Amino acid sequence: MSMEEKLNFQTSQDFSATILKPKSEEAIVEAIKHCYKKNIPLEINGLGSKKSIGKNFQSQKTLDLSSYSGVIKYEPEELYIKVKSGTSIKAIKEELDKKNQQLAFEPNDFGSLFDGKSNEGTIGGVLSCNFAGPRRFKVGSARDHVLGFKGVNGKGELIKSGGTVVKNVTGYDLSKILTGSFGTLSVFTEISVKVLPKADLTKTLVIENPHLKKGLEYLNIALGSSTDPSGGVFYPEYFRNQFIFNDLTTE
């Protein structure tokens, strides 16, 4: 038996299931290749934190990457971490906390906003959507923090771009193209992300104002002030009742 035949044998899956849960890169390749050959629409899912975002579509099968997770390599001194795409943001934060580091682009926690239960999703989901938090204007979007990746395109072919430092990228930067493509161009399998040290102290100032014009005026003043804020966000009053600020405390 050839090496390729052994690989196919070891990663062989039951494709009759509606939800496919690969635990290896080879299994992801096999699943996508099968769906491509059979012309089967495929939904890509991690922890389901962003399922309500975007346009709904009809899919016959779901590729669930929640079981394909784990830290591959973490180099605090080199300011990067390499993880599998199904790794939860929570797990990554716990690892970075050990060295007082962070994902500076602040992955959104939509779970906390809409039902009060934290669900930041997976790193693959965050980067597929290119979502970032209130620090975006200061540190850039999620795609600005991707150093490199491995992935699988719609035909089931492995692709790779970048590495673990910015200078690894020459020509077209596929990382920036695929980040924000909502899984339509490729499924991430491994991702190298830039990390940064945490600040010694952070403070959040909340100004409640029901008037849209006045609220935006306050925000512009704050962001342009000499205090050099690291982030900012404006919530219109008509949205406020839909959000649950379950971890907001005052002093």
Regions inferred by a protein language model and the residue ranges of each:
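N-terminal basic/disordered segments at the start of proteins
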Residues: 1-9, 31
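Catalytic cores of large soluble enzymes that bind and process phosphate-bearing ligands
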Residues: 19-23, 80-84, 141, 166, ...
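Short, hydrophobic/aliphatic alpha-helical segments
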Residues: 27-40, 107-118, 157-178
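Structural signature of FAD isoalloxazine-binding scaffolds in flavoprotein oxidoreductases
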Residues: 51-70, 84, 135-155, 187-190, ...
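C-terminal substrate-binding/cap subdomain adjacent to the FAD-binding core in PCMH-type
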Residues: 128, 147-251
